[in-house]
């Protein structure tokens, strides 16, 4: 689907756990899992890049963390409000690629795009071997929904409230997989890439960067790779992890 600018009507905006919200906007969209939209609230000058959590019929769902002025204004929006949106943007994950045995690995709000990714991969190949590994600080979210599409779910939390107490990288048996698809904090993805390189496992990561335009013009979101600087919003956000220079 080509990028477009539109004013979407908010259908639902609810808090899933403390500081994490689920925003549903009425909009018919065809996206690649891992793509994102720039979402602008009325009192902010620039939009915020928010990845697509899932597409259901004529609704697009975004799951976001409240971390600044834009997202803190976003959380106050109610059903019927209009919100300015540009997208879909970026490349997303290639769901037609033969990944073999796949591990979906996320950290924190990087869990958001994993739902649409799991749905798309399962729809494209019902026999795919696919497990989900999610790392959270304390409370967990989207896990039950993702579990509907994967074979196995394993969770870690920093506090030990759910699953393994520690980091998600500590519960990831790379020897069981051919490919890792990952999204989360850069420090976590760097560790995952290092582990995959050592284990000779393919890894694709969705980078999270500050963005101003979302269309490749401002060069705020540069990602360093072995083949030169890339624009996260235009050339990414999904990159071959083994090519990224952290």
From Swiss-Prot:
Required co-factors: [2Fe-2S] cluster; FAD
CDD domains: DHOD_e_trans
Pfam families referenced in this protein's UniProt entry, alphabetically: DHODB_Fe-S_bind (PF10418), NAD_binding_1 (PF00175)
Co-factor binding comment: Binds 1 [2Fe-2S] cluster per subunit.
Molecular functions (GO terms): 2 iron, 2 sulfur cluster binding; electron transfer activity; flavin adenine dinucleotide binding; metal ion binding; oxidoreductase activity
Similarity-based family: Belongs to the PyrK family.
Quaternary data: Heterotetramer of 2 PyrK and 2 PyrD type B subunits.
Protein name in the entry: Dihydroorotate dehydrogenase B (NAD(+)), electron transfer subunit
